[in-house]
Regions:
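Short acidic (Asp/Glu) patches
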Residues: 1-4
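Short, conserved beta-strand element in jelly-roll/cupin
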Residues: 7-25, 54, 75-78, 83, ...
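Short, flexible, glycine/charge-rich loop motifs used to bind or transfer phosphoryl groups or to couple energy/partner
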Residues: 6, 72, 94
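Double-stranded beta-helix
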Residues: 25-88
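Sterically constrained small-residue positions within well-ordered secondary structures
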Residues: 7, 65-67, 97
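Hydrophobic alpha-helical segments, principally membrane-spanning helices and signal/leader peptides
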Residues: 19, 70, 90-92
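Non-heme Fe(II)/2-oxoglutarate
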Residues: 42-47, 81-83, 87-135
């Protein structure tokens, strides 16, 4: 889930996936678990004390990413926007076709949410700030 990597308190991350080309089963479309956003966070990727990163297990592991676990393909046409709740389990498979599957991905978090200092995605010399902090 995106919340695993972009942790905020309270949870606020939303993913935006813009299909720049058709995304199909052949070229590696996204797959998602219907209702999976209602689950509690299972993991958190964070900076480890002393350097490096670690995956902290918080609860039950999310189901494996396959159709047998209930994941469904999100085949879409070029120009489609898929909005992903931060807790929604999703993935894509390898593109096994000769066609590209270009997409643009953007994540947004609430600028009033707390972004912990041990989140892996940040630079101490360039702190993450919300738009409201700009002067």
């Amino acid at each position: 889930t995106d919340h695993t990597f972009l942790w905020t308190e309270p949870r606020s991350v939303v993913g935006f996936w813009f299909a720049l080309e058709d995304a199909t089963l052949d070229n590696g479309c996204l797959w998602a678990l219907p209702g999976g956003h209602r689950r509690k966070p299972a993991r958190r990727f964070r900076r480890a004390p002393g350097g490096g990163t670690t995956m902290e297990v918080l609860g039950d592991e999310p189901p494996a990413g396959d159709a047998e676990a209930g994941f469904v393909p999100l085949e879409v046409r070029s120009g489609t926007l898929i909005v992903l709740d931060g807790l929604l389990p999703h993935y894509s498979l390898a593109n096994r076709s000769q066609r590209r599957r270009a997409a643009y991905t953007l994540h947004a978090i609430d600028p009033t949410a707390h972004y912990p200092s041990d989140n892996w995605l940040q630079r101490n010399d360039l702190p993450l700030r919300g738009f409201r902090d700009r002067r």
